């Protein structure tokens, strides 16, 4: 009798563990079922990156002052700044600048803390190469701007799911003239500037009214 009860207990434990594994697997399945039903046919179709996407770093040689702030704030001290001291002007003279994207973690610290804004993040993410040494970009390679997804004639740009209008899951069925969900940062800035100019105009008009009254009293 005791042996039978032990077998029943072992069978129950195995059944419970099997049910747990089954629920875990179905959880992954149900999670994918709630996602977008249509995939992107890459590389003929590409998703439009977000406005704050951290892609390949763009570098402007003329703006760089060789302060090496980017090197100090980098978690792995990645940027290589080659400069010499000009004895006549007693200033740093930049010779070369390079970043190894094989080791870069794209944290954006160098872009955030650059005092002259000579570094910026682009939307380029296609950095695959057969040789890892080719991922070491010098100042010439860093100075090239990538082709935008929306301006590339050989690619069909598609919006990300958060930028689609409410109720639409498939970006392929969205008309080109359909308004996107949310506003671009440039649109928000323009609206804020317009509101600010309206407030300034109202304040100026209110200041002019007492001046006119004073002139009439005189």
Curated annotation (Swiss-Prot):
Stretches of Basic and acidic residues bias are at: 192-202
Protein EC: 7.1.1.-
The cofactor named in the record is: [4Fe-4S] cluster
Q: What is its main location?
A: membrane
One Pfam assignment: Fer4_7
Cofactor binding description:
Binds 2 [4Fe-4S] clusters per subunit.
Please list the residues that bind [4Fe-4S] cluster 2: 74, 104, 107, 110
Domain 4Fe-4S ferredoxin-type, first and last residues per copy: 55-84, 95-124
The record ties this protein, via InterPro entries, to:
4Fe4S_Fe-S-bd, 4Fe4S_Fe_S_CS, NADH_quinone_OxRdtase_chainI, NDHI
One of the protein's GO biological processes: photosynthesis, light reaction
Instruction: Report the locations given in the UniProt record.
Output: Cellular thylakoid membrane
Gene Ontology molecular function? 4 iron, 4 sulfur cluster binding; iron ion binding; NADH dehydrogenase (ubiquinone) activity; quinone binding
Q: How does it sit in the bilayer?
A: Peripheral membrane protein
UniProt catalytic activity: a plastoquinone + NADH + (n+1) H(+)(in) = a plastoquinol + NAD(+) + n H(+)(out); a plastoquinone + NADPH + (n+1) H(+)(in) = a plastoquinol + NADP(+) + n H(+)(out)
This entry carries the following GO cellular component terms, namely:
plasma membrane-derived thylakoid membrane
At which positions is [4Fe-4S] cluster 1 bound? 64, 67, 70, 114
For region Disordered, the annotated ranges are 179-218
Q: Entry's Gene3D superfamilies?
A: 3.30.70.3270
Q: Where is the composition biased (Polar residues)?
A: 203-218
Q: What keywords tag this UniProt record? A: 4Fe-4S, Iron, Iron-sulfur, Membrane, Metal-binding, NAD, NADP, Plastoquinone, Quinone, Repeat, Thylakoid, Translocase
| Oligomer and partners | NDH-1 is composed of at least 11 different subunits.
The role this protein plays is: NDH-1 shuttles electrons from an unknown electron donor, via FMN and iron-sulfur (Fe-S) centers, to quinones in the respiratory and/or the photosynthetic chain. The immediate electron acceptor for the enzyme in this species is believed to be plastoquinone. Couples the redox reaction to proton translocation, and thus conserves the redox energy in a proton gradient.
Similarity field: Belongs to the complex I 23 kDa subunit family.
What name is this protein filed under?
NAD(P)H-quinone oxidoreductase subunit I
Q: Which organism is it from?
A: Prochlorococcus marinus (strain NATL2A)
Report which gene this protein is encoded by.
ndhI
């Amino acid at each position: 009798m005791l042996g039978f009860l032990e077998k029943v207990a072992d069978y129950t434990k195995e059944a419970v563990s099997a049910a747990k594994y089954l629920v875990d697997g179905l959880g992954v399945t149900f999670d994918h079922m709630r996602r977008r039903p249509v995939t992107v046919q890459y590389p003929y179709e590409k998703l439009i990156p977000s406005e704050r996407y951290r892609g390949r770093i763009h570098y402007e040689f003329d703006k760089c002052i060789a302060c090496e702030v980017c090197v100090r704030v980098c978690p792995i001290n990645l940027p290589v700044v080659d400069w010499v001291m000009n004895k006549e002007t007693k200033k740093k003279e930049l010779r070369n600048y390079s970043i190894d994207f094989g080791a870069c973690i794209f944290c954006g610290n160098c872009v955030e803390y650059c005092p002259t804004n000579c570094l910026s993040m682009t939307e380029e993410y296609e950095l695959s190469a057969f040789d890892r040494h080719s991922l070491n970009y010098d100042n010439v390679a860093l100075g090239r701007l990538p082709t935008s997804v929306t301006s590339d004639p050989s690619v069909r740009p598609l919006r990300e799911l958060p930028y689609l209008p409410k109720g639409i899951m498939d970006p392929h069925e969205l008309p080109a003239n359909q308004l996107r969900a949310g506003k671009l940062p440039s649109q928000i800035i323009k609206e804020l500037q317009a509101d600010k100019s309206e407030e300034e105009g109202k304040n100026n008009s209110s200041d002019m009214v007492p001046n006119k009254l004073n002139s009439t009293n005189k």
